[in-house]
Amino acid sequence: MYLRQGDVQRALPVLERAVGLCQSWHIPLFLPIEVAILGLAYVLDGRIDAGLALVEQGVEQQVARGRRRRLAPAIACLSEAYLLAGRLEEARQRAAQAVDLAHQYQQRGNQAWALWLRGESTARQASPEVELAAGHYRQALALAEELGMRPLQAHCHLGLGNLYGRSGRRDEARAELTTALELYRSMEMSFWPPQVEAALAEVEAR
């Protein structure tokens, strides 16, 4: 929860303890995903190389256990880690894989997050396909609204706002960013509002 709220410093000790407990208590079922999430937290904390190595390790462990049903969230973590590291094509490929796996096993929440990652990895390309990226965001948003995933709803509106802002579509960008800001504030997610406010200011300055 802390990680999705953007509070990496509070998330890290919780995740490190979870991995330690899985190892010391010999709980292999949950270890791969906990390792992957911890790696993502390290990447968010700026420890790119160490974090990527951990996420990749978590995915490899999950693959080795042959539990494809549990693979989608680990693959999504890897996609997000690659995204943060600027490895956009790898992020896009892994996001597509996570979407397919989540759809196959009817994991709609995982599918929603993976669709958002498809939007992000498409939108951040040097010459993004705007409508393709927007379509991924809107698919993710529709699922997030249906499932009550409000943090993801906010992320989708933020992604759309940034995408439209870079494309010169000021009115649409302003509407999406304003919605994102309202959602983040209503959930007291303090990490993102400054980013949204900066994006809004940039849109107004264009």
Residue ranges and their predicted role:
Residues M1-R206:
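Helix-coil-helix junctions within alpha-helical repeat/solenoid scaffolds
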